[in-house]
Amino acid sequence: MYLISVEGGDGSGKGLATKIVAEILDKEFTFTSVEKTAEPRRDHPLGRLAIDSVKMQSLKPEGEAGLFAADRLDHSHGWILPRLKEGKAVVSERNIHSSLVYQGIVGKLGLERVAHMNSAALVPDLCIWVDCDPKIALKRIEGGTLRNLSDKKEYFETSELQKEIREGYKNLLSGKLDMPTPFDMGALVGPILNETSESDFRKKLTTILKNFLHSKPLPINVKSNDVEIYHLRELLYSLDGQSTLENIGLKKIR
């Protein structure tokens, strides 16, 4: 039903936040299921092309942005949307805001240009912006764990670049820069500082999720009756096809 993205610079704690958010949603709310994902997709050919273009520095920013957009559109409509229609919550480590910052601001393509390239992608219902001091982020990266998970060399090699990325997120997600259409429709919360204990971080994320979900926002990417139709279809199939609703394409199971 809801797509929730977690954004922030490398080493800020996005992976941890994604894990915690999924745990909170699964434990405290009544979604049919909670699924985690990430962009770019390291286990998909389109995602690998995008990652390799950065590692090899083989393309100009526009080419890189095109590969990230292609991966995102396929991910949006081939994987995420079907799950949202089933009433599931999807938590994505990185989504559209990463492209807006990395290619639009840092890569100097411009926000409108990158937004246009991604205009057919899903819009996160909630974006959680995670932040920490760049010095702390670099220590986490240099500790080895993040480097191993990130296939060594990608975007996060220098402290100067870390500062530029952090400033990009700050300018975009704080409202200093206008969020381009259609990605201005979702809710945005942050910065959520991840500089102390995990328990403190968890408390902050729990408060955010409760505030968001208790407000009962309408989903951006699916209609409420999409979820109802899915569950009705499942119910009718479970009754061994004894009922038929032609308007939702059901046939009796013989």
Task: Indicate residue ranges for each PLM-predicted region.
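Walker A/P-loop
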Residues: 15
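Post-Walker A helix-loop "phosphate-sensing" segment adjacent to the P-loop in P-loop NTPases
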Residues: 23-34
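Hydrophobic anchor at the beta1->P-loop junction of P-loop NTPases
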Residues: 4-6
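ATP-dependent small-molecule kinase phosphotransfer cores
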Residues: 32-119
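Nucleotide donor/acceptor-binding cores
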Residues: 1-2, 32
